Amino acid sequence: FIIAALVEELIKFGTVRLYVFNKPEFDEVTDGIVYTVAASLGFAVLENLMYSFGPTTVLLIRGVTAVPLHAIASGIMGYFIGLSKTRRCRSAAPGIILAVLIHGFYNFFLFISTYTAILVIPLLVISWRVLRSLIRKAQLFDGAST
């Protein structure tokens, strides 16, 4: 569960790092969140296309939960990418670790049994609240830098 999450989150991290991290437009903490969420949504579309060839129920569950999961976990990672870009934090590693843990728990809850799948809902709600808090912090950092 963790290996798949690690690979997927590193793909999204690598995409942002490779394509937008060094752009002059990436100059605020919030930019890290925005660019990483955008990368995650593109990833989620491609992943769901792969699942579209399987059972309809899997596609429906993934369509409702996987897209928010990717956006939320990557948004949290993006906050730390933004911090590292603006020199407020040495490394984006804490964000990568958090994203992998959230994603790993998501995978675990969904794949272990139908009974544990319900735990995806509180995981997404709690993670969403964390992301909202980080967005507010990012806006404060960005407001202080202008």
Question: Whereabouts are the PLM-identified features?
Answer:
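Specific transmembrane helices
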Residues: 1-7, 11-22, 119, 123-126, ...
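Small-polar-interrupted transmembrane alpha-helices in polytopic inner-membrane proteins
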Residues: 4, 12, 31-51, 96-104
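Membrane-water interface at transmembrane helix exits
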Residues: 7, 11, 16, 20, ...
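Functionally important transmembrane alpha-helices
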Residues: 65-138
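Short, highly charged, low-complexity non-transmembrane loops/tails of multi-pass membrane proteins
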Residues: 136-146
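Membrane-interface helix/loop boundary segments of multi-pass membrane proteins
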Residues: 10-39, 53-57, 85-90
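Membrane-interface helix caps and helix-loop-helix hairpins in membrane proteins
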Residues: 52-61, 108-114
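Short aromatic-rich membrane-water interface segments that cap or initiate transmembrane helices
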Residues: 1-7, 58-69
